């Protein structure tokens, strides 16, 4: 008898899991709220790479996407030229870029020689993954609407705001949840056009998905509905010579035109219906329509973009580095002169790349993606047959949604969005004639090395995050007994330790570097005030005043509380060690803001 090979999960099935599970992870903790979801995405990506390499003996060369190589090269150049990286973000970014490079390379090998069946199976797996993730995510939003999280067996992330509620599912970010639901809307059209979703199931899915978009209060989600409707019209045009099937009306052009109209109509019906129900039952939902009509809806983004542009102008070639956006934003608060929310990203992918990687990084990415797009349009849309065009259009629709979101936020900084983004780029990449082959033994050897290294990284990341997390939530009595992270997230643990330490004139000089590093990690009002006091204690009162004065441009900078704390610190230190001129200035500032300070005056250590 013939021996059967051991059962294994196919790459399309693993792809569905890799899309679905990470965005459904409900656990969010400090110091990195998205760690568990992103770690899950990385684990499943490694599994997908391994499964892809095991499916066949690759016989041709395969390179990762050029834009990934550009970003890796820019990161290495930053390291070689001494660009600051006190936050430790460069190493983590390199690890992510290498993981995505391995995934795209494995996908290209898996699809060599080109196989229509394999390409279609992967696309179907991707569509099902988007749909399942979004449907379950929308259900979690309804759980949150009725405050049922305590009865969900920890499967639903808690929602903790009482007013202007924008329900976020398990992603803890409403715009991200809306993007997942937008991707799923396009997936429903694709699956229905293939006869895999009958009309009643399709309509039910659309109603649930668009209810999730309404509950998220996301303006980006409204745009996604429009993109999905346009895709349905394009799909109808592409299906004009397809004939379709009488038992599946959505495989025909008329059915897809109706789908486009229904996508818009359902949103127009659900928006006022849910709003009216919210007022009737005191759901306290966010008013998306009113926000869309507001004249200043982009003001916060424009302020961030001004900071990003100034970073690019002052660091044009290689940018400020991957983890230094917040630090440079803090440094230039007075120079820009507008009130702004402190952030680690520009909330615009183009400006973010310009600020962080300069002309070399952003320009290289622009060239690489422009060449990629031209090749895709030429080979997939112009020269491709009808089926190839239909498949390419849905993937381009998904990419359009991710890029639209990236113009207003930073979804591609999260693995559960960036990995699918890279996968779609690689899936669309036209096959090129190969000049040389890669021996099977070499591929297997590299695969083993990759699995070992990736396994070590994932295990140590898990261990170190758990250590950083335990320290974050520990009380002071047990804090010093807990181990520090060894390889990853040490900067977060150091910042937490610095913030917990009582400041005195005796330890000021020793603690100042750790506080500055913590501000590099994220400039919070608390660390800014503590650092300013340390500057004053170590003979740099002007620097301390400068740091505190920047709080006036810091959205929610909590000036009153920070001035009050520094003022109390001045009063509690011995006169011989007190920087008197600085303390006199602080006393005057504290008096001016005393009315605001009273609410928080009980806190002695911010």
Task: Annotate each PLM feature.
Residues 2, 12-24, 28, 40-52, ...:
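Alpha-helical transmembrane segments of multi-pass inner-membrane proteins
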Residues 28-31, 83-95, 161-177, 293-299, ...:
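Short aromatic-rich membrane-water interface segments that cap or initiate transmembrane helices
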Residues 1-92, 98-104, 108-124, 191-200, ...:
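Transmembrane signal-anchor hairpin modules in multi-pass inner-membrane enzymes, especially those
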């Amino acid at each position: 008898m013939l021996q059967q090979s051991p059962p294994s999960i196919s790459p399309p099935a693993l792809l569905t899991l890799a899309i679905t599970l990470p965005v459904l992870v409900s656990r969010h903790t400090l110091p990195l709220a998205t760690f568990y979801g992103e770690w899950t995405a990385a684990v499943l990506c490694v599994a997908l790479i391994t499964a892809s390499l095991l499916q066949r003996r690759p016989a041709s060369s395969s390179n990762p996407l050029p834009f990934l190589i550009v970003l890796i090269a820019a990161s290495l150049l930053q390291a070689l030229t001494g660009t600051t990286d006190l936050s430790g973000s460069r190493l983590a970014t390199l690890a992510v870029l290498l993981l995505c490079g391995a995934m795209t390379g494995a996908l290209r090998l898996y699809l060599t020689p080109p196989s229509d069946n394999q390409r279609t199976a992967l696309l179907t797996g991707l569509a099902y993954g988007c749909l399942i993730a979004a449907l379950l995510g929308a259900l979690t939003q309804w759980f949150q609407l009725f405050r049922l999280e305590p009865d969900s067996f920890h499967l639903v992330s808690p929602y903790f705001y009482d007013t202007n509620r924008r329900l976020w599912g398990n992603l803890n970010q409403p715009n991200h949840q809306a993007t997942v639901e937008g991707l799923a809307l396009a997936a429903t059209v694709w699956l229905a056009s293939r006869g895999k979703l009958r009309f009643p199931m399709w309509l039910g899915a659309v109603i649930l998905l668009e209810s999730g978009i309404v509950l998220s209060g996301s303006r980006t989600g409204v745009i996604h509905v429009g993109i999905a409707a346009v895709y349905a019209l394009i799909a109808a045009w592409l299906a004009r010579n397809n004939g379709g099937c009488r038992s599946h009306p959505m495989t025909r052009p008329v059915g897809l035109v109706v789908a486009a109209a229904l996508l818009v109509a359902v949103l127009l019906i659900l928006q006022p219906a849910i709003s009216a129900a919210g007022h009737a039952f005191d759901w306290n939902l966010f008013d998306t329509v009113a926000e869309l009509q507001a004249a200043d809806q982009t003001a916060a983004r424009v302020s961030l973009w001004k900071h990003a542009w100034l970073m690019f102008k002052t660091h044009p070639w290689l940018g400020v580095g991957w983890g230094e956006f917040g630090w440079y934003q803090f440094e230039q608060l007075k120079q820009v002169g507008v009130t702004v929310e402190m952030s680690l990203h520009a909330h615009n992918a183009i400006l973010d790349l310009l600020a962080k990687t300069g002309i070399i990084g952003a320009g290289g990415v622009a060239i690489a993606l422009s060449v990629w797009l031209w090749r895709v349009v030429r080979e997939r849309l112009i020269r491709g047959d009808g089926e190839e065009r239909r498949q390419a259009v849905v993937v381009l629709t998904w990419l359009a949604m991710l890029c639209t979101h990236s113009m207003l936020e930073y979804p591609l900084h999260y693995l559960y969005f960036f990995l699918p983004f890279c996968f779609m780029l690689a899936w669309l990449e036209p096959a090129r004639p190969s000049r040389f082959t890669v021996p099977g033994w070499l591929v297997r050897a590299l695969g083993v090395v990759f699995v070992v290294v990736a396994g070590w990284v994932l295990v140590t990341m898990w261990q170190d995050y758990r250590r950083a997390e335990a320290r974050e939530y520990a009380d002071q009595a047990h804090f010093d007994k807990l181990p520090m992270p060894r390889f990853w997230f040490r900067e977060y643990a150091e910042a937490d330790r610095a913030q917990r330490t009582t400041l005195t004139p005796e330890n000021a000089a020793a603690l100042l570097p750790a506080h500055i590093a913590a501000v590099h990690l994220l400039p919070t009002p608390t660390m800014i005030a503590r650092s300013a006091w340390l500057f004053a204690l170590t003979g740099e009162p002007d620097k301390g005043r400068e740091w505190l004065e920047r709080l006036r441009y810091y959205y929610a900078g909590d000036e009153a509380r920070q001035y009050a704390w520094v003022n109390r610190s001045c009063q509690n230190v011995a006169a011989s060690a007190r920087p008197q001129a600085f303390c006199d200035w602080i006393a005057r500032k504290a008096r001016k803001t005393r009315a605001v300070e009273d609410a928080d005056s009980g806190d002695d250590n911010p």
